Amino acid sequence: MRFFALFIYRPVATILIAAAITLCGILGFRLLPVAPLPQVDFPVIMVSASLPGASPETMASSVATPLERSLGRIAGVNEMTSSSSLGSTRIILEFNFDRDINGAARDVQAAINAAQSLLPGGMPSRPTYRRANPSDAPIMILTLTSESWSQGKLYDFASTQLAQTIAQIDGVGDVDVGGSSLPAVRVGLNPQALFNQGVSLDEVREAIDSANVRRPQGAIEDSVHRWQIQTNDELKTAAEYQPLIIHYNNGAAVRLGDVASVTDSVQDVRNAGMTNAKPAILLMIRKLPEANIIQTVDGIRAKLPELRAMIPAAIDLQIAQDRSPTIRASLQEVEETLAISVALVILVVFLFLRSGRATLIPAVAVPVSLIGTFAAMYLCGFSLNNLSLMALTIATGFVVDDAIVVLENIARHLEAGMKPLQAALQGTREVGFTVISMSLSLVAVFLPLLLMGGLPGRLLREFAVTLSVAIGISLVVSLTLTPMMCGWMLKSSKPRTQLRKRGVGRLLVALQQGYGTSLKWVLNHTRLVGVVFLGTVALNIWLYIAIPKTFFPEQDTGVLMGGIQADQSISFQAMRGKLQDFMKIIRDDPAVNNVTGFTGGSRVNSGMMFITLKPRGERKETAQQVIDRLRVKLAKEPGARLFLMAVQDIRVGGRQANASYQYTLLSDSLAALREWEPKIRKALSALPQLADVNSDQQDNGAEMNLIYDRDTMSRLGIDVQAANSLLNNAFGQRQISTIYQPMNQYKVVMEVDPRYTQDISALEKMFVINRDGKAIPLSYFAQWRPANAPLSVNHQGLSAASTIAFNLPTGTSLSQATEAINRTMTQLGVPPTVRGSFSGTAQVFQQTMNSQLILIVAAIATVYIVLGILYESYVHPLTILSTLPSAGVGALLALELFNAPFSLIALIGIMLLIGIVKKNAIMMVDFALEAQRSGGLTPEQAIFQACLLRFRPIMMTTLAALFGALPLVLSDGDGSELRQPLGITIVGGLVMSQLLTLYTTPVVYLFFDRLRLRFSRKNSKPVVEI
């Protein structure tokens, strides 16, 4: 009593406290960073190693395996995957959430150093690592085009200057430059000219390497001067290499230009990049796992004027893709939704109280509570994101509830003629415990979320804490500022009989009278109501089992990502044509704004594309509808497939799959994996629940096997090392020397000129110089035959792995897809040597599915414990919790009605409903218990009177929560697909709960009261007719 009086009778102090909360909140709001979702990125590090010319199997066994054994000893590694292709190995390390990325990077470097002695010689450089997830979509893509500069020169400028500058921006984790490669001097050998001159390929390589050296020469000095010695020991251009003498034939000098074409070109000619219809160099920028995407993008944009200033006039630098506009638009939509929710809630209060002064009180209390929450968010290190702003939107209905309960009770005393200050004090005292019970039990709902681990726990933590803080501030405001404003602003009202003449008041009175009549009938037919209650419990269980489920709603971020997979024997020239054809099909779609792509590198038959759609307001279709439309057109392209998927704000795992979800096959036997993977993939492709089924197992590439006749080789004076060196020199794009320039280092690349390697007959032109100096054709000691070979070898842990990726057809949920896959695997009878499991997002979904029911039960149990402590009773909490089944039925039916799967967002809605709907029961039970204690009423009379007296605040709080969530349901702008499931769940649950709990709660209250009396061996009081 004195606590409430302290604030009621000291209005200046109370106002200043509220002002301080508001000012701190405004400051926190201005300092809060902006993000699409809470920070949930796993720490990921990518290790890269190269050995040009080495086969995928060689890379896997000699490079990947030693590194994996060393890296696998690092603490905190959640998953380790590797992919080895022609001349390249990439290992992805995904760490636990609590692992510091900088400490992990130090451990990775130490592991690389430890494995160095086990790696093969001939590697052009040591393995390197980068702190970025290659499977993440770039946050920004910049393109460089030029009419006069070559692609190699553009690539050199981009990688040497632009990429280095961008990498220094805070938040940038990796700048991947694609579309070409660094400049190089390429030596294209003529096999016939070499044979005629009697020059081996090794001799050419050694001559080039010896002619281009960079060694210190020292200095000469006398008593006065010192001269540094400098020589022309380096060759830097193709023109300087051409006259190089590599051999003497009968006293005549054989120069490099006599047996080879020497050109200024690039290290790897099998690379191509495009933006729309023009050749381009792409700078694909990814953020650090812990970085904020908006702050990082803003930092890059702020740097663009400086970048453009350093670019020559012949180069055009453009932003091809930027993830931030849709994120900003989505957050703006949420902020507008929040404003609409506040307005609707205030409107509900006005319609019920029919007083401008009374409405002003919650109109002040709600903003103070919401704005004050921003200060706590900043102190907790949170961000303004879709989930935290959705929490505040939903909190609008919660924070007004506390004010409504206090305000309505004070207004009731004023209508009875009590003086304002006395009414404020008395009314607050009567409902103070009720408000505290409602708030504490509501916060208790979120305790299990705060203790939840893994990705879902990290994702929901900001939501739970933000909402809990808003409720806590609301509790303080409703017990201090609200009664003070009531005492000083409101006046004694007209008698209720006069208010009934007004429109809304007359409707409310009519509803209350109708409710009273129907409640009398219900209390005389309790068994029927009991059957209905048990029916809702059973229906909850059936609906939860039957409803389709998914992990997270499919977002429309306005960005698509596509992976091209062509025939495994395709050439680079043909693959570049496929890239152009696919880009033309996509560019012609009316919903597409920009498209970029690249192909080449170690995987000739693959490519990547990034598509930016037009803003949501400029296109009629969602991203998924655009994909469905393009899928039909793209399927007509022969010899290759393009798999499109909408970029999501949450992507789990480090695999670069060509679809959103993955199922991984593991085996210790590579042969068993290669036998069963095609069978499983074929069976999964036939499932209607899956779309775009594809695999990263590529073991059908064209290969030419050379079989050495070792006896013949020994007789001819040739060893295997010389033969292998011949092949590497001829066909491996071998980097044989380094050119040092002030800004970068470039390579000299040697191979047989592509003009002489158009078919297999090129092998017949190869020869080896034996120990006697004679040229021995390769065909003398080797036979060759075509065969199939892998284009890549994949590992997970230390086991051979193959990942089958898939998308979901429109109207199919992830739970339906995973159930179909599990069923198919059982039907196929896959042997135990081949193990299958979901990975990435699908794996997290499986884990979340297993914990959802536990989480709901834990929330209910926590609320029960809190209510039991507050009421000092085992029974009354059960009465209050009896409101939950009807809310669950309403929520699940609403999701089914809107064809929305049960997702993590819908789970949040269910958790919120646990907190919302029990408020009705708390208000009923509190007044019933007080009436029994102080008024001497029977349980039947007490609960009946409580239901009628609390009908108006129950309607007000329910409608306030409903109207607070309604804008989430009706929103259709950017990010609406994320907000709608939450609104649908809450609105559906509130409607059904309001219809049923007004009747089931009194019946359950009486049931438990009679049960209590029976167990305490007391005679029940006779039922009093109402």
UniProtKB/Swiss-Prot annotation:
The keyword Signal does not apply. Keywords: Cell inner membrane, Cell membrane, Membrane, Transmembrane, Transmembrane helix, Transport. Gene3D superfamilies: Multidrug efflux transporter AcrB pore domain (3.30.70.1440), Multidrug efflux transporter AcrB pore domain like (3.30.70.1320), Multidrug efflux transporter AcrB TolC docking domain, DN and DC subdomains (3.30.2090.10), Multidrug efflux transporter AcrB transmembrane domain (1.20.1640.10). Its main location: membrane. The chain crosses the membrane at residues 15-35, 333-353, 360-380, 387-407, 431-451, 463-483, 528-548, 853-873, 897-917, 953-973, 984-1004. It holds the Pfam family ACR_tran. It comes from the Bacteria. It is found in: Cell inner membrane. It is a multi-pass membrane protein. The keyword Cell membrane applies. One of its GO terms (molecular function) is xenobiotic transmembrane transporter activity. InterPro entries: AcrB_DN_DC_subdom (IPR027463), Acrflvin-R (IPR001036), Multidrug-R_MdtC (IPR023931). GO terms for cellular component: plasma membrane. Part of a tripartite efflux system composed of MdtA, MdtB and MdtC. MdtC forms a heteromultimer with MdtB. Belongs to the resistance-nodulation-cell division (RND) (TC 2.A.6) family. MdtC subfamily. This is Multidrug resistance protein MdtC. The lineage of its organism: Bacteria, Pseudomonadati, Pseudomonadota, Gammaproteobacteria, Enterobacterales. The gene is mdtC.
